Amino acid sequence: MPVVVKFVRQLAHDLRNHLNAAELQSAYLIEVAENEELRDEVKRLRGMIAQVGVSLQELTAALSPPRLTEMPYAARDLMEDLQQKLSASYPAESAAVKWDDASADAQLNIDPQLLLPALTELFANAFRHGRAEGPITAAARSENGRFVFTLSEPKQNFERSTENWGLEPLHSPGQGHYGLGLHRTRAIVEAHGGEFAASYDKETGSLVTCITLPLAAPDA
């Protein structure tokens, strides 16, 4: 799989170079075109080219090792920010999530600009992939010097293996999605010195994702 990832990153880089050339050419055509309608069409084409470039940039970013800019962050603030982000992005779905934040005064040292989207990705998957009847529950606590976050989502007849959860990029691609979300989330968690795991609880019919992060040192 590392070879495939390297190939995709190089391919995306090469395609972006071609898109940059097309962008420059379209800018030139806008300048020399005498017909206003033609200029408008070239501008529209330029916008399409730019969107492809954005998609390729997002693809390569998802496959690149995370670069952290860490700062002290209260676990309670992280949970509050996560709830606000979910409410803004998924107002209907997030309203039904049950929260249990027992992290108390736990302190973390994280990059919130990376970790918040990584956690949001877990909820996005829970909202749109094979959800069964029942509430999604999210819980946070501190335990043995670690911050523990668990997400439980109801799923019936779940048969996928969770052994390599988040270790198989490009596994389930679809239109506009390339199977990179869990891979990126896991990479970000592990870059923070954390652990990422998932298991299926047959008794409750729930897929349980567990993330642990080290608590900040007392003087952090």
Predicted regions and their residues:
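Conserved C-terminal segment of the DHp
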Residues: 21-36
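Conserved DHp (HisKA) dimerization/phosphotransfer helix of two-component histidine kinases, i.e.
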Residues: 25, 39-92
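Conserved catalytic submotifs in the C-terminal HATPase_c
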Residues: 96-106
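Short helix-loop "hinge" at the ATP-lid/N-box region of the Bergerat-fold HATPase_c
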Residues: 125-127
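Short beta-strand/loop element within the Bergerat-fold HATPase_c
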Residues: 133-145
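Glycine-rich/acidic phosphate-handling loop/turn and adjacent ATP-lid/helix
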Residues: 148-176
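Detector for a conserved hydrophobic position within an alpha-helical segment of the HATPase_c
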Residues: 189-190
